[in-house]
Amino acid sequence: MVSSDAYVEGLAAKLALDLLRVYTPTGSEERLYPVLERWASELGLGFSLDSAGNAVLSAGPDGLPVVGLVGHLDTVPGRLEARLEGYTLWGRGAVDAKGPLAAMILGLHLASSEGLSCSSAVLGLVGEEGDSPGAWSLVSRGDTPLHIIVGEPTGGDGVAIGYRGSLTIEIECTGHEGHSSNPERGAADMLVKALASILERDSRATVTRLKAGTAANITPGRALATVNMRFNEPGLEALQLASELCSSLHQHRCHCSSISLLHPVKTSLSNATARALVASLRTAGVKPRIVVKRGTSDMNVLSIATESIAAYGPGDPRLSHTKHENIRVGDIVKAAMIYSRTLTILCNSL
């Protein structure tokens, strides 16, 4: 039995800080396994790794989890000092999404201490900030829980029932390679023209990566760029747009070397997980906000396998991926209480 508010706050601060101290940009999630295994043991939870490298912290009856609290172990690149200042935690992933992950682990512990009637787990997935291999593995193996709460920052009062889709286009341009005094245009010039035409054509397009050149006095023969676009329309419309954009690049001696698409997701507020989250927030005296988030998450993938899915978590999403990521310990605790209550509601509904 969990004994006091001070005890829970202490657990939240220590757990979250331990997670933040381990730098885990996409591809290095295994660094977090020893920390998660130690905390699982301390909190009386089971611990295992699946074939994709996803971490599973389990509670309740044996078997595949019926209810899953799904977070991710990776962060975007960019090391930040992990520290606790007063009651605020700072560090890479404080908001996206180790703060929510800590809240989910604590929430599972709280629910388990009261007794869970169904198999439940925190699933720490790999590669969410990349191509979501952890989520795709769950779906392809048929191991997706019946009810899923995705742990992403929603301000602690938001229930996200949708995410936009994402279209990523890799562009490669060629041009004259030689001395910069040569009048012939290099690949970088071609790339600038190509990107200008894309940005003029569609305001949703954003250039996220550029690579060209080796020296100030050499025009590069090859230049690369990545363009990302978020959208609400059906994925087939986005693919048609990508095809048109790529066709238009040939006049600039450029082409699309790859196109990747993540479809948008929009679930019903009446699904069991969303209803349980709303009920838990209201019980806690919080007025729920129903939101459709502007980015993407593993919810875009996992929604293929279940309709009972929604996202919720502590933290200001505006701080995600910034150098100012921070989260209050109290917000982690409040979210843990919401997760715990939601787990109980969903288990009791079976």
From Swiss-Prot:
Subcellular location, record wording: Cytoplasm
- UniProt entry tagged with the keyword Cytoplasm: yes
Q: Which domain of life is it from?
A: Archaea
Which residues does Zn(2+) 2 bind?
D96, E129, H321
Identify which cofactors the protein needs according to its UniProt entry: Zn(2+); Co(2+)
Main location as per UniProt:
cytoplasm
Keyword terms of this UniProt record: Amino-acid biosynthesis, Arginine biosynthesis, Cobalt, Cytoplasm, Hydrolase, Lysine biosynthesis, Metal-binding, Zinc
Q: Which reaction does it catalyse?
A: [amino-group carrier protein]-C-terminal-gamma-(L-lysyl)-L-glutamate + H2O = [amino-group carrier protein]-C-terminal-L-glutamate + L-lysine; [amino-group carrier protein]-C-terminal-gamma-(L-ornithyl)-L-glutamate + H2O = [amino-group carrier protein]-C-terminal-L-glutamate + L-ornithine
Q: Which residues does UniProt mark as catalytic? A: D74, E128 (proton acceptor)
Binding, Zn(2+) 1: H72, D96, E152
An example of a GO molecular function for this protein is: zinc ion binding
* Function as written in the Swiss-Prot or TrEMBL entry: Catalyzes the release of L-lysine from [LysW]-gamma-L-lysine and the release of L-ornithine from [LysW]-L-ornithine.
Q: Its family?
A: Belongs to the peptidase M20A family. LysK subfamily.
The name this protein carries in UniProt is Putative [LysW]-lysine/[LysW]-ornithine hydrolase
Q: What is the lineage of its organism?
A: Archaea, Thermoproteota, Thermoprotei, Desulfurococcales, Desulfurococcaceae
